[in-house]
């Protein structure tokens, strides 16, 4: 079904630009300082056009598959004041935690980044609830020596000069595949509720050296009744990871 979204004419035109001895061209030459800057900036128009193009195709994919995708997707209470901004697989854990907290009367949310570069302020603001007052940005990376991690700095820059901008703090999670659990996500939301939320924090570890970690909460399960959970132990290169991946695919393909 997705094949129809690809223009064969445009694809052929793109492939025709590949290097070929039948149509020799010179590429990669050095440019002098008198023109390099101008040439580098000339590509802005192409980057600026990407978000709208991606949004359009995401809309078409949604129509075909029924799965909704946008450059930024929001999940949670429509009038939430405290939200998390994150991207990647951790957002699934965050969404389930939001449902758990909603059952307890908590109004929180998550703004999921699907198109990171080029970063679109227009689509971010379109997805952001007007009620938001505090934001915790989660990065799965560490930039030693910087004032913050990449996504956090993007969000801070986004609100530069904006009147009544929400408070923005940042934290790190999941380095080297460290598990990110619902209890840790709850601690992030609880941090936002403080009079002075902690910035430059970590979750998932106990940092007893630089004391940047948020207080660890007792772990709890939010899986639905009837769900089977398994934990497998293996040694390096013994096939455990591959076998489990294949098993998950088989179960997924044969589960209604």
Protein language model annotation of sequence segments:
Residues 1, 95-97, 122-123, 146-150, ...:
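Short acidic, glycine/serine/threonine-rich loops at helix termini
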Residues 81-83, 91, 95, 100-103, ...:
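Glycine-rich, anion-gripping cofactor-binding loops and their flanking helix/strand elements
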Residues 134-222:
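Peripheral docking tails and interdomain loops at the edges
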Residues 1, 182, 197-199, 204-255:
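Thiamine diphosphate
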Residues 1, 75-78, 102, 127-130, ...:
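Solvent-exposed alpha-helices and their adjacent loops that cap or buttress functional pockets
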Residues 59-82, 213-229:
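Glycine-/acidic-rich phosphate or pyrophosphate-binding loops and their flanking alpha/beta elements
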Residues 1-74:
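Conformationally flexible catalytic loops at phosphate/diphosphate-handling active centers
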Residues 64, 79, 83-114, 226-256:
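Anionic-ligand anchoring segments at beta-strand to alpha-helix junctions in alpha/beta enzyme folds, i.e.
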